[in-house]
Amino acid sequence: MKRLATGSIALTLLLAAAAQAQAPRAPRAPPAPAPRDANGHVSFSGSAKDIGNWEGPANASIFFEITDGKKVSPAASLPTNPSLDDVPFQPWAKELYLKRHASLQADDPHTRCKPSGGPRMFHTPYGLEIVNSPDTNEVFVLAVGAPHSWRVIYTDGRAHPQGFKPSWYGHSVGKWEGDTLVVDSTGYNARAWLTREGVPYTDKLRLTERISRPDHNTLRYEATVDDPGAYTAKWGGGWTLRWSEGNEPFDYLCQENNRDPGRMTGPKGE
């Protein structure tokens, strides 16, 4: 009788588990909407009650998805991203890209703690903060780790200054198109890489970025590269970043944490 009772209990548990597995799951709650700043624009920031920062995609290939010659499609990439064959390189730029890609980090400016420049800032593995400043009509983009750098996007309607001295991040002005911040940047010094894989550019670069926050947890970044010095036509791509709740900026100094002196010496180690 005891064996029969044990078998009945086991059968009951099995049937209950099967019924639970077949039961429809409750629909997942939709993500919260994006917050807004004092001017009514979408805010890319956190708050005192919503601490966090943005995490970029883990895959190093961002504009075009390639790994050892094979195209891949990480979830963070936008479906409109071009393949390598579709990027309108000038011959010298393609040759330089392939050389850099074959020996990643050997000539990477990041190895010497140089700033990211351009789209690469939105692909940092250390976290990214974007701060709306409605009072001053500015948006600050802050790279949390590595060279601890930042850039300012002016949204007060100003034009690019005449005779601007080229710099790592150039000069950026932005305007709102609905809930998308459209940023026009020029004045780059061409000393950085567009991506972590060594995509080159020249001082003729004009970069158009579109930054939006479709929901609380998602940041969408798109960039169009217009550089007649390195490419035969405009091109671009983009990816999404995820909100990492609870993360805060941490003290990370690239120079103090560099443990690769072999890459710091030689003709590129200035």
Feature-to-residue mapping (PLM):
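Positively charged n-region of N-terminal signal peptides that target proteins for export
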Residues: 1-4
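Bacterial N-terminal signal peptides
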Residues: 8-16
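PEST-like low-complexity, intrinsically disordered acidic/proline/serine-rich tracts
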Residues: 20-270
